[in-house]
UniProtKB/Swiss-Prot annotation:
GO terms for biological process: defense response; regulation of insulin secretion. This is Tryptophyllin-13. It comes from the Eukaryota. Keywords: Amphibian defense peptide, Secreted. The keyword Lyase does not apply. GO terms for cellular component: extracellular region. GO terms for molecular function: hormone activity. The lineage of its organism: Eukaryota, Metazoa, Chordata, Craniata, Vertebrata. Its main location: secreted. The keyword Nucleus does not apply. Expressed by the skin glands. Stimulates insulin release. It is found in: Secreted.
């Protein structure tokens, strides 16, 4: 759910 690249993995992304 973060606009960064490479995208870090957070629970909110799932």
């Amino acid at each position: 759910g973060k606009p960064f690249y490479p995208p870090p993995i957070y629970p909110e992304d799932m």
